[in-house]
Swiss-Prot record:
This is Tiny macrocysts protein B. One of its GO terms (cellular component) is membrane. Gene3D superfamilies: Tetratricopeptide repeat domain. The keyword Phosphoprotein does not apply. Residues 356-372, 1123-1144 have a biased composition (Basic and acidic residues). It is a multi-pass membrane protein. Keywords: Membrane, Transmembrane, Transmembrane helix. The gene is tmcB. The lineage of its organism: Eukaryota, Amoebozoa, Evosea, Eumycetozoa, Dictyostelia. It comes from Dictyostelium discoideum. The keyword Cell inner membrane does not apply.
Amino acid sequence: MSSTKSGSSKYSSGSSISLIMGFSRSLEKGSFGVLYAMIKGNTFPRILTILSMLIEFCQLSSFGFKHQYPWGGDAGYYLKRIMSPVSHPSDVFGYLGFTILFWIAVGLLILGFLNIWYVAYQFYRGKIANIWIIRTLRWFVSFSVAVLFIPIISLLLIGLDCEGSSEGTILRKFDNETIQCFRGANLPIAVISIILIVVFSIVAFTSSATYYEYDTNVKSRFSKPHARFDVTVLFAKFVFAFFNSLVDFVPWLTSITFFVFMVILTFGSIIVLPYNNQRLNQVRSGFYTVVLWVSFMTLVTMGINDETSPATCYITIVGVFFAFPIGFFSNMFYFKWLSSKVSDIQILNQSPSMDLKDANKKGKRNSVEKESSPTSKVTWGKQPITLGSKRQIIFPFFKKKFVMSFFVEIMARSILNNNNEGVSSSSNESIERANNLYQCGLQYFPNSDLLWMAYCNFLFTVRKDRHIGYAALEKLRRMKPSFDVRFFIYQRDKEREQIMDSDLRGPEHTGKIQDFVSYMEFKKLYYGAKRHHVKCLNYIKRFWGHLLHETVDLHRLSDLSGRIATTENKANESYERLLALNPNSVRVLRDYSQFLEEVVKDKESSYKLQKKAEAIEDIMSKSQTTDFKISDIKAIDSDEDDIEKTLQEPTAIQLAKIDADIEKSGSKSGSSKSKDDSSESSSSSKGRRGKYKEFQQSNAINKLSWLMIGTTCCCIIFLIVVLVVFRGLEVKHTNAYQGIISITDCANEAVQMGMHLNAMQAYALVAGVGNNTVEASLIEIARRRALVKRGIIIMKNIHDAIYWGEGNPVSYVGDNLSQLKARDGYDIFDIGSVIFTFDQFNRSSTLLDNKQMIELYSQPSVNMSVLVAPPGSNTTSLYTQTYNAWKAGNAFIESAMLASDVTFDELRYSVNQNPNFKFVTINAPVIMPDIYNKVQTAYIDSLVSDITGTLDAILYTWCGIFAVLFLICAVLFRPIVRKISREKIRTLVLFSLAPKDVVVKLSTKKIKMVSLDSGSERDNLFDTTDDDGRDDHLGEDDNNIQTPVGDNNNNNNNNNNNNNNNGSISSNVTKSDGEIGSDGVRSSSGSNVLNTSSPYRDRRPLMDSTSVLASTATLNNRNVRLQAKDEEITNGGGERKGSDATRTALSEDKKYGWDGKSKRNLNKKSLKSILGRLHWSYILATFLLFGFITMGIWVTFTVVFNNSQSGYTLGKSCSRSLNSRVINYYVAELYTYSQYVSTQNMVDAITELQSSHQSLPYLEEVRPLMEGSYGCWALNKSTCLPPSSMYYEEVNSGLDRVVDSLAKKAINLAYTDQAALLDSPDLQWFLALIDYIFIGLDTATFTYFDYFLEKQEWANTVLTAILSVSCVILLVVHVVLFRPFMNHLRIQHIHTLALLRLAPDDIRYMEVSDKVIDED
């Protein structure tokens, strides 16, 4: 019982171990597949190797200048800023930036790992992954390991860099944000970081150990004998990143670690000499010596620990210039010393023809002589061709203890390098010396897998001895080598497998498939070509099988013919690409030859390819190795001009495009016509080509296709133009908003100037009266005078900007709006300091071109009041004079300039008789606002008119484009579609006329490939991108039902007989008299069904046979074929000599319902319905095109039109602000003792204020200001009302209540007695709050302005999105509808031509009447 348990436990343990070992082998196989796909022929080019070395130098140097080291002085500060600006890029952005960067890196790494897993899985299954996936994998591993290893590891370590605190364990990098280390949001980051560090490190170390070029013959890349030193460098990088990320708070530990590892790397780079290129080794050693110097000075800096002294910095910088040459020359001297050890090695001068025994004897004598000499270091014994298993060469240097096995490879490298430098007189002698050195080294280091790997590499790449190389490889395999050596063996095995497939690749070093990925792509392409080839033959067989039915479905025939043409085209393209990659592949040449013969019917080109394949095969069979000379192949049959041309240009065998130009095909075929044809036949052939050209629609389809491309491009360009126009309107609309505010502010300044002049007069009148001192009045007058002068400049600039058409009047506003815009981020300049000249305006606005604006600025339409004060008279009167808007504004500004300069005495005594002063004060409250209100209205109307005109132009243009589209459909599409459809039916009807024996023979022909691949099942191992796989089941009923023999066994037997009777096709068709004996149909002039005629009559053939096969050589004479057929009929041997399959099919006529003589039923309805859908296709596509564009334009029209009305709303808000100033003007007049006070004008201004205020929309953006939640709206917050103010509650209730109070109090003041006016609380309310109200109303206006600008930007975004989507939709409509439609037309035409290639000559020249086509 116990023994049973023990046995079972042993069995379980053994099975577990075997499972583990099997899994490890599977894992190794997958990883080796990934590495091989990634590495083969695609290691770093020279320039990338140099760049990666420079990046590595910078990364390693930066570890000496981290933040924890006390580099002193400004020099130390800048060194740390330059060499190590940040610990990691994520530190710059905080924890949020680190998180974003972390997940981006994680996503890219996961994609890379998935890529690795996919490639490994495919290789494990024996497949090859997609080519682009392999290329992506190469760049991912190369870039992430060689360049980004330190940044990625450092980034992953940031989430693990924790420290303890009172709040728990937090991330040390972001201690100010208090991020918990293994809790909350950082927990998944920490877990994923640990996993990715392990996985990424495995990937990095594995690729570093294997990702290198070992072939010294490759000149485009730097080769290496091994990559173990690179693994050491990568480990040092990992340690540096780990220590500087997690323990950087212990600078002594990081600095010592830095120094120790740099000592190892520096001496390692000198001793190991990792690259075969010695100059690169020297440069690398120089870089490592520089970093070693930096690490040493880092220790010195830590010891001094003085952050004020820059001495160590300067010493470090100076020492760099000495450290590099020290490392450089140390490497060079070491290599020379090691090379000098082999300088005395001598080899026997053996001629190539020398007998091996004689050479051994001579070698023995020389070795004895050399051993007797005092300078001899090497003893040569007898040296047969072996692997060094016996100690026959004595080299005392290898007995020394410090000598390591890799010294042998370095010394052999020096021997070969000396040969390259011209030291050795013979290349073969150097190779033999190196070989002997390797064998000597293997005797002293027999267990060194590294040395055996170097020796195998030498045999394969340098000595070119594959036999001994593979023997050495097997020896190495039995040694249980390390991982990198096992991968080297795997590489050589794969290369051997690739070489063994020579019948597919052809001779080595020819073609373009030396790269592994290119080779696998070549194989994948080859199996795809075979698949298409076989499918094409199957479809041809199905096509003829369907014709055995009594009722022939033309739709099924059309479908099969389409598949024949499609697979033929794919196979042809695949074969041409294969020959372009490798023109000497025997298997491809044979398969392509068969394809040209059986499908394309191009026998001459097929013969050329077959002959070339036989010649190459003969050379390859005679050769004992895989080394070929391409000149041997190119010399095949060089005496024949046509074959020579074929061999020199393998891709010159071009199939004629099935839709090629008929004129070119006709000219080529005409030159190859047989001389036996009569002149009448030649002229008849030209006539047939001319008639065929009438229905040949290739050129028409191409032109129509380009026309549709042009039409779609025009529509897209139209939408782009519309978008540009609408964006231009948006800019114009935005500038118009600016202009509306500017116009109102111009009127505001005019009203304010009038009020200030009245105030100046009032202060002059009350000077010295009561508490009003003269000094105080003068100060107030001076302040008001400065405001008037500034207002004049502002008004002048705005007035000129509007008239001259300033394109961007954003700065042309009053002081309140200017501050509001500046606070909101607008670029504002001061317009109140200097008057701008004409040249300083950009004058790009076109709104002034409106008729209404032109009339307003050029026609007298404004009545201005002018004061009449005759000299010497105390009476004054007012006179009305008509101005235009431009002259009125200029007159007002000029008068204000003069009025602002009046003296104190003039203000006090004689200003009422000053016409300039009174011109301003009288016209300011009514006339000037009225002028600018008209200008504003005309300005807005001009904008709306411009928008409406643009929309109308776009609409009319689109209607014209749609009309053109409709004409294209009616005039071009319909005739071409109808013509192609009818010719399709006409061609299919012809096949129903084929003799039955021909149909039976072609439907039972056995499909057999010439080139049989022993690994034919391997094509199932390759992924396919074919989209015709789903069509393989189409017509399976044809194979089952339409087979003329009852069972498949009979089929196969009969097919064998058919191969011997390819030329015997029974036919009763007689071209001379137009009879078809087997079908019982005789052509006659009165027949409406079928008409045949002689070549001398005007018949309408579907295609000239020589036109279809334009690339073929001279065809057999048609008269000879007809004569042969007549002889067969005459001798009566057609049926007797027919195949068994033909006799069997004829005996089973009843099974198919057609006896071969009676007329068959043709089902044309389904095909006609399908072809009829073509008309609906282009109609639907056209209306979709029209619909999408119309919908996009309609939406954009709606958005633009709605926004165009927003100018009126903004104008009302501006008018409300203007009316408040007019009201304030009249209130000021009430206490300035003015004799021109008009109560009615004041009431009108109040009414307009209320009207504007009540009609403005209640926007969400304005609601806080109106309801009081906005707070203090003063521009200067120091002027806000304190809570202790008696007006605080009223103002705090919102601008809506304040405006209402303004209107009510202004009405009260208008009807208050003059004597009680000064004591009125309403007047005190005005004096306290009016400036505050102005700012509030201006803020409301700016809010409306900003709202409409945002709405305009949103509309612009919507317009851009809609029109962009419309452009994409148009492109999609073209790609999804128009392009497939044109391709469908072209395919229908191509299929028609492909059908003609299948048509026997017996029916090809027949004419089918229109009645047969039209009948159902």
